[in-house]
Amino acid sequence: MAGAFLIRRSWRRFRRLFDDLALCPLLDYRAYRQTEGKVYRFTGRLESVTGDRTLWIRGDKLTVPVALAGAETYVLPMQEGGGQGAIFDPGEEAPERIRWDRVSTLTDEAKVFVGGTLEMRDDCRIFAASPGKPLLLIFYDGPDRSLAVRAIRAGRHRNEYWNPITPYALVLGALFLIFLALSFLPRPAFHVTALVAFAAVFIPLFPMGPPGVLFTVAYRRLWLQARIFRAYRDLARLPLIYLEGGTGKSCLPGNEQYGAVSLDDLPGEAEGGNIPLLIPEEEKRKKDRWFVYGALPEPGGRPFEPADVFAVYGALPGEPEALARRYIRKACVFEIAAWLLLLTGIGLNALFVRVIIALL
């Protein structure tokens, strides 16, 4: 259980860090030559990894070094499947966190996003992590403009209750129960206690045995749906990075005006794919209005695609905070239902085993 909270917290931190970097300026040649100690974003392609743990990223007009030591490095999973549903599905795989020594095994020309502090080291400006100043590296494929949505959508664990800590917890629990059973076994008065302890060793296997395995399958489906709703919640909140309350206007890091317009009907451009939907159209309620986010045009026009490729551009089927509250409620309902099904399956299997033992 503790591992589940740690895993969920780590992915929440990943998404928050990416959101914070969206408000930082993009690094260009002028800033690279004149500033240090400030936080920037930069994108390019993997050029090389040198022996001193330095990654070189080649952009359009600039090549910058990145100190891999201490960097939080992730590989974004490729989008699987096709069709409209796959666009919004966070997928079953979370971004993979990798060690610095695995970076050199990645394909040459892989796309890279880096965000963090630009420091001066050995007379060279370099992206580097330091205490209180994290450095985020993301390797990805596909269009740059899709990275922000994909990172927030997929940046969550498949199932927090099965994580890297879980196998160790199960082994330690099993060893403790075996030790408990062996300590009580020589005492005739505690034979039942010893048998119960031995039986408890196999409780983690109960969800996978018949007939309760059907409940486990249903549990996994409900849990995946809850994960999708949590992704929708975070996607609905994406525009709030730039606009407090989801309305009004603000200025992007590149001094471009950013804002939203509220419409009764979905613009025709969206039907042709020119305005991406951040959440499926089917999620809209009749009383809600469409909110289109992007760079602000002249008064009376609709927002258009910002020059900053990481700025959110798209339409939401409702007000962001209201959508976020709706999806978190749905996610909680599905998670509770999933747990009830799983526990029901375990109880059914326990009853099944008890009946078999009684017949023997």
Locate predicted features.
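OB-fold and OB-like single-stranded nucleic-acid-recognition modules
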Residues: 1-360
